[in-house]
Amino acid sequence: MNKLMSIITIGIVLFSTSCKDDEINLVSVEQNATITDQSVTEAYFNEAGDLSIQAFNTPTPNEIAGGRTNGTITITVEGDTRFNGAIVTLTTSGNDPLNPEGTITIDFGDGQTDPRGVVRKGIIIVNYKGLRFVPGSKTITTFDNYEVNGVGIEGTRTITTSSFSVTPALSVSFLVKDVDGKATFSDQTTITRNATHSHTITFGNTPGSTTWTVEGQASGKTRTEVEYIFLIERPLIFKTECVFKGFSMPSEGEALFTIGNLPVGLNYGDEGAACDNVVTVSINNGTQNITVNN
């Protein structure tokens, strides 16, 4: 499940944006830059949240609870090359094994480069409280001089388990909130972000039949100080079937990305749509299909 979350959360990007040369470009250079910047910000915040969940899911229940005594241990996140070179530590602070508390730090130091060429610097700090997947348990993620490819990330992401069900299928739901989020680019311009989403993972009988549903909205200001809202109008559906085929975008769902007073509709696919990386963009009474780069 952790690998699924890694792939899917990165795929939440709005559309990171290059059109084919033979397509009519309905989006201005400025609008395209705004959409691209928002895509980067969305991706980096979701990845940071995923890294925190990955780290939280790695220790044993006894290590999370601290055993009989509190202390600090170093943990290793297996199978995820994004953690290459990072030092991950777990410090427990609570004294109730049924309601454990502690802090996980993911320290990339002065810079670590993963096999895909992504450079991460600084520290992700994950404070947790409660047993994994138990309703009410949560992780609170903050940052200490954290950067991805030169883009600084700030803010607080809180992930709270809202429900756990075994019928009609095994599923876990989370409430995800971003508060005072900010991405700072190399020219010191920023994108701000506040967001509230609900995430639900529904596990199928086979690895390729698991789905991930995302609802909610994000809002803030662009690098040019224009207000924006990204509202999911029809739940975004991610499928492991599609991920395994190399398609990281949602296979279904719609969103409205409003930049200032300009509404931009995004359609990722209707119910039962085939796996692809095509987004239908609606703008100024016209539509255009854009193929997204993974």
Kindly give the residue locations of the regions a language model identified:
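C-terminal motif of bacterial Sec signal peptides marking the signal peptidase cleavage site
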Residues: 15-18
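Low-complexity, intrinsically disordered segments exposed to solvent
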Residues: 21-294
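Sec-dependent signal peptide recognition
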Residues: 2-10
